[in-house]
C-alpha cells in the first residue's frame, strides 16, 4: 500500500512519451498524497485513478478471507475530498459518482495536459482479484470468491 504513485512517477520520468496511469485505493493514496505536489511542480503527467470506498481495501479483503469478516481498523470515513486536495497541489481533480460519467471524465482527464486525479466512488463491498495471501506463492492466489 502506498507504492503505486511513486512508482508511476518514476515510470513517467523514465518514459515521458508514454501515458502512465496508476490505480490506487483511497487508503493507499492517503499514504503518499504529498507526492501530488511534485507531479505539478515538475510537470510529471501521471493520471491517478483512485478507487474510493472509505476503507483500507486490502485489509478488508484479508479480514474477509482469513478472519471470518471480523473487521477492525479498516474503515476510513474521513470525508476526504481528493479532487480538492489534488487541486490544492496544482493537479486537476475529478470526481465520479455515477457509472455514466466514467468514460466522459476519463476521456477529459486523459486528454488534459499534466497530471490528473480521478476519484471514483465505489461500493465498500468491491474486492480486487486476483490476490495472493501474505507468505504464499503465486500458485496459491485467490481468483475470486472465498479463500481456499
Can you annotate each of these PLM segments?
Residues 1-148:
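Thiamine diphosphate
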Amino acid at each position: 500500500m502506498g507504492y503505486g504513485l511513486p512508482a508511476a512517477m518514476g515510470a513517467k520520468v523514465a518514459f515521458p512519451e508514454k501515458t502512465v496511469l496508476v490505480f490506487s485505493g483511497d487508503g493507499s493514496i492517503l499514504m503518499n498524497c504529498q507526492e501530488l505536489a511534485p507531479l505539478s511542480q515538475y510537470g510529471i503527467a501521471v493520471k491517478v485513478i483512485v478507487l474510493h470506498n472509505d476503507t483500507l481495501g486490502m485489509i478488508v479483503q484479508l479480514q474477509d478471507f482469513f478472519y471470518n469478516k471480523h473487521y477492525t481498523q479498516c474503515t476510513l470515513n474521513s470525508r476526504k475530498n481528493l479532487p480538492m486536495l489534488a487541486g490544492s497541489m496544482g493537479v486537476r481533480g475529478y470526481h465520479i459518482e455515477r457509472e455514466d460519467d466514467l468514460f466522459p471524465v476519463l476521456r477529459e482527464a486523459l486528454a488534459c495536459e499534466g497530471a490528473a486525479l480521478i476519484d471514483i466512488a465505489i461500493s465498500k463491498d468491491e474486492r480486487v482479484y486476483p490476490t495472493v495471501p501474505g507468505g504464499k506463492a503465486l500458485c496459491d492466489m485467490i481468483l475470486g470468491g472465498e479463500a481456499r
